[in-house]
A protein has these predicted regions:
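Ferredoxin-type iron-sulfur electron-transfer modules and their immediate structural context
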Residues: 6-381
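N-terminal Rossmann-like FAD-binding beta1-loop-alpha1 element of flavoenzymes
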Residues: 385-411
Length: 414
């Protein structure tokens, strides 16, 4: 089957020599589209082990990742689908603008200390009137859209009459009281615009209940947290796109300041790895996955570019994500409140790509051919040597993958 890049078929994507040719075509395209970037990248790729500031490497990767994304999109002829993914991300921006600029900055300060607001019928009617401007939009998105429009009106009214400013102020106050009322209401508990990090108590991380008064040693988990097995159906309720993007926006993109402790760990002044209150070392991701960089690409609406970044250090990411480890979360810069849920974001990025046309094949290609991986940008041909891998857990199958890319024949047993 011919691909979207002239001269390549789908079968070629499994042939090491053709992957090398594909890498050359990619490089020619970047050199033509962005010569300065290609010169910088070529110098980096020529000596990947040379000492460089971490921020410089991060900058190169996040600038090159969109080129990889566009090239792969063209290769599989899915430009329309990737544009749709970007538009879907952009459509959520209103939610997070409202969450930060209105709810966090204007509403939360009014409810600190347990103060309960008083919502009048007039306030409720005002909010209904504001939301009615977005018919056919589900309630959370409509509230966010109405709130953002109201903030825009407020900015425009600064140069208007006293009556205009007073009318906008009255609407804003009504919306503030409405949000404060429903901030913790059962009906809106799942809304991302009302989900904010809670303080972390290190000695109460696991919620328990003691159902037997005369047997305090009997402990059970909250009923709402239980997953009841039904045959062989998947009971893992991974996050939806809104919750994933909520935590992407929660991340402060520490890589730009070389403070991405989720990747590099938290260190004492003497260079030793810090430990939390439970004595757990905060070493960060054991794979040194470029987490903050992934978040930046995903925030920009480019899940394919984000996955390309992930697969440099974690090519077997379908086996990680929220299923295995959370070392990155433990070392997140947020130590006194809930951390960014990086594993859920990683799973979300992978899932977004798998949902694209040819998604599984795209993921597979990125594990064999990835220009961002300057140490091994494409798989090598068979070198005549065979290796037996015993044990196919996460370490075993990852080792097998890397050996295959280095040209070894691999037999795995478990």
């Amino acid at each position: 089957m011919p691909m979207g890049v002239d001269g390549f078929s789908y079968a070629d994507l499994h042939v090491p020599a053709r992957l090398r040719d594909l890498h050359a075509v990619f490089g020619q395209g970047v050199a033509a589209a962005d010569p300065p970037l290609w010169r910088e990248w070529s110098a980096y790729a020529a000596s990947p082990g040379a000492p460089r500031p971490a921020t410089e490497v991060s900058d190169l990767i996040v600038r090159m990742a969109p080129h990889v994304s566009r090239f792969v999109s063209r290769l599989f002829r899915i430009d329309e689908a990737t544009a749709g993914a970007a538009a879907g991300t952009q459509a959520l921006d209103t939610l997070f603008r409202f969450k930060v600029d209105f709810v966090r900055r204007r509403v939360l300060p009014t409810v600190k200390g347990g103060l309960k607001p008083s919502l009048s019928e007039a306030d409720a009617a005002t909010v209904d009137r504001l939301v009615a401007a977005w018919p056919g939009t589900e309630r959370e998105a409509a509230v966010a859209a109405a709130g953002c429009a109201l903030m825009d009106r407020e900015a425009a009214a600064k140069g208007g009459s006293d009556a205009e400013r007073a009318a906008v102020a009255a609407d804003i106050d009504a919306l503030k009281r409405w949000c404060a009322t429903f901030l913790h209401d059962a009906a809106t508990r799942t809304w991302v615009i009302f989900r904010f990090p809670e303080p972390v108590e290190p000695f109460a991380l696991v919620q328990i209940e003691r159902p037997c008064q005369d047997q305090p040693e009997v402990m059970i988990g909250p009923d709402g947290h239980r997953r009841r097995r039904d045959g062989f159906g998947l009971t893992d309720a991974r996050w939806d796109a809104r919750n994933v993007m909520s935590d992407v926006h929660y991340c402060v993109l520490c890589h730009e300041r070389d403070k991405d402790t989720c990747t590099k760990g938290i260190h004492e002044k003497d260079g030793k790895i810090s430990k939390n209150a439970l004595g757990i070392p905060l070493a960060g991701c054991p794979l040194d996955e470029k987490i903050s960089e992934m978040h930046l690409l995903r925030k920009a609406g480019d899940p394919l570019g984000a996955l390309a970044i992930v697969t440099v250090d974690n090519p077997m990411c379908p086996g990680t994500g929220h299923r295995i480890c959370n070392d990155c979360m433990k070392a997140c810069i947020y130590q006194k409140q809930e951390p960014v849920n990086i594993p859920q974001i990683e799973t979300g990025v992978l899932t977004d790509v798998l949902r694209l046309p040819w998604g599984v094949e795209i993921y597979g290609l990125l594990t064999r051919w990835n220009p961002l991986n300057v140490k091994r940008p494409y798989a090598l041909p068979y070198n005549g040597k065979n290796v037996l891998v015993v044990g196919i857990g996460p370490a075993g199958y990852t080792l097998a993958h890397h050996l295959l890319n280095e040209g070894f024949g691999v037999v795995a047993v478990d």
